[in-house]
């Protein structure tokens, strides 16, 4: 099952999705998957209110048909990861607010279907990123936090990415604490974690001082529920 591939920049010659898919008749399913590359170039970032996230999954269709209807269950994997920023486990700090978050170095495209094999445990899913060879870093995306005091959630979505010292997704958090505006950059490379599809990453601002903020990164895999799996220190 390949879902939500309309308006993803895949069929660049402006064909309708149906016509584009018919072009793969006689080709292998892998040829279709290799061509299913979405673009991530909107200056506002990925807005799920206007653009659905591509998803993929497999299922077995039963041979028995009930009154002309075939019913089957299918687990779908989202092609993007989600990033949230919390303030003190969503409890906030007195005098602290988030002003804006600038995301740098995210990639400009990604595969709708991963070429990696998902883990057999459904709660683990994919453990490796799968990235188009022509993917490259795109321009910064700025998110207005509208003076949020406890969290900025469910608004930052990113393609898969390998994070290292030379190219890593970075969030620059602009904030105000007791009337003084400051900013701090937090990077995925500091945690040695890649960005993997269908995962949720939570940066929790665990403490604030007059000069800086300290963060910890939560790594979440279970259906995007915000359940703590591991909490390495952010230093």
Model feature map: region roles:
Residues 200, 204-235:
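Intrinsically disordered, low-complexity repeat and linker tracts
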Residues 69-71, 168, 200:
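A generic structural signal for beta-strand entry/edge sites
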Residues 38, 43, 51, 131, ...:
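Short linear sequence elements within intrinsically disordered, low-complexity coil regions
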Residues 1-92:
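Short, low-hydrophobicity acidic/polar segments
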Residues 74, 101, 173-175, 203, ...:
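Preference for bulky hydrophobic residues occupying beta-strand positions
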Residues 1-20, 63, 82-86, 90-197, ...:
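Tryptophan-paired
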């Amino acid at each position: 099952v390949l879902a939500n591939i309309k308006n993803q920049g895949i069929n660049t010659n402006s064909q309708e999705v149906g016509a584009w898919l018919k072009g793969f008749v006689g080709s292998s399913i892998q040829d279709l998957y290799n061509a299913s590359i979405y673009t991530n170039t909107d200056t506002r970032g990925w807005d799920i209110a206007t653009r659905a996230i591509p998803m993929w999954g497999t299922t077995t269709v039963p041979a028995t048909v009930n009154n002309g209807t075939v019913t089957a269950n299918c687990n779908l994997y989202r092609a993007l990861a989600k990033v949230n920023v919390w303030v003190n486990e969503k409890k906030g700090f007195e005098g602290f607010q988030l002003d804006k978050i600038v995301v740098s170095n995210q990639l400009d495209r990604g595969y709708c279907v991963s070429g990696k094999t998902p883990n057999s445990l459904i709660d683990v899913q994919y453990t490796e990123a799968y990235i188009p060879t022509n993917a490259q870093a795109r321009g910064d995306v700025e998110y207005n936090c509208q003076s949020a005091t406890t969290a900025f959630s469910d608004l930052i979505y990113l393609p898969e990415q390998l994070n290292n010292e030379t190219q890593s997704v970075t969030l620059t958090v602009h904030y105000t604490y007791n009337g003084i505006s400051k900013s701090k950059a937090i990077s995925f490379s500091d945690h040695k974690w890649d960005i993997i599809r269908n995962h949720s990453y939570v940066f929790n601002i665990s403490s604030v001082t007059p000069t800086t903020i300290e963060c910890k990164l939560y790594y979440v895999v279970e259906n995007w529920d915000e359940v703590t799996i591991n909490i390495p220190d952010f230093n």
